[in-house]
């Protein structure tokens, strides 16, 4: 019994550790500072951080002599980035409660902090892994981002996607919930929340075979979503096609975790309906090109959906599906978003203020202002001159602590 507890339950302890207060001071001087996507940039500005919070920002900030200075020659500073769609499902994350800090720090840097991510949303993983990572990060034994997790995603009855069956260990498939009734879905969601989940992920449309999508019964999706909303949690959906998107809309989903990639029937009226309901979308454009096909006949209709959603002033969140997609570089996502008509300010909004607002923490993070949490990204170049500069990160600072530096 002791071994079973150690393996299955001990990693789930303390699922929401308190974020420790930051200590010390640092400054970034003579930088171009984008305090938010909508404010004018500060040229030759300084950001001063004390005890994990922004102390001051502006062109005339005095830096005391005892403050650590981050070297920054003509660099650019923004608020810390969010990746609103990640997964900790690669085998290298297994047994995260016990792996060495050095190994996990290297993996976190490679996948996340070297890309500027100070906050990430895990859209479905083994909670024993994700909760262990979060606990070790928040107790300062690891250098990593803040983690929101959906815990175990919910699938339609007999609706595990074919690509997960082909890639995940067989024993994990056993634990992937496929509720047959609305009542069962609610019980699973309540259990998820008790184990530390911060949001709900529904596969409202699941590719059970290549080219065939199985929609989730609307009653199951709706009751599960209602359960999450009663706890103040957001609901994500993997929609896949028209039917899956309609289930997402009708069941009260808040965020599409992908643009629907089977685009037939996903027209302007449907997109407008999503925007009217204040749904957000995470495009994950590179993922489609990397894991499905680079055929323009497949990709261009997806890009057209994103263009239309953006033109109708729908809220877009940045996310890459990294962890499922094992190419961690973010450059291609930025290029693809630019192809959809987004400029640097639009993309900065996706990376910062939009997710902070959607998750209800805009008063704490998402922009650079005195009193806010010192989550910062230092870039080598200006994304207003080159959109891929968002991918060239020099330093990542979370809660006033340098968690990545070149």
Predicted regions and their residues:
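Histidine/acidic-residue-rich catalytic or RNA/ligand-binding cores of hydrolases
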Residues: 92-95, 130, 245-253, 287-312, ...
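Divalent metal-dependent hydrolysis catalytic cores, especially in the metallo-beta-lactamase
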Residues: 107-130, 144-152, 197-207, 234, ...
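Histidine-rich, glycine-flanked metal-binding segment
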Residues: 13-14, 18, 24, 33, ...
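His/Asp/Glu-enriched, well-ordered alpha-helical/loop segment
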Residues: 16, 298-382
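Alpha-helical scaffold segments that flank or form the walls of functional sites
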Residues: 95-143, 176-198
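C-terminal cap of metal-dependent C-N hydrolases
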Residues: 31, 351-353, 357, 370-406
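Active-site core of metal-dependent hydrolases
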Residues: 202-300, 322-324, 341-343, 357, ...
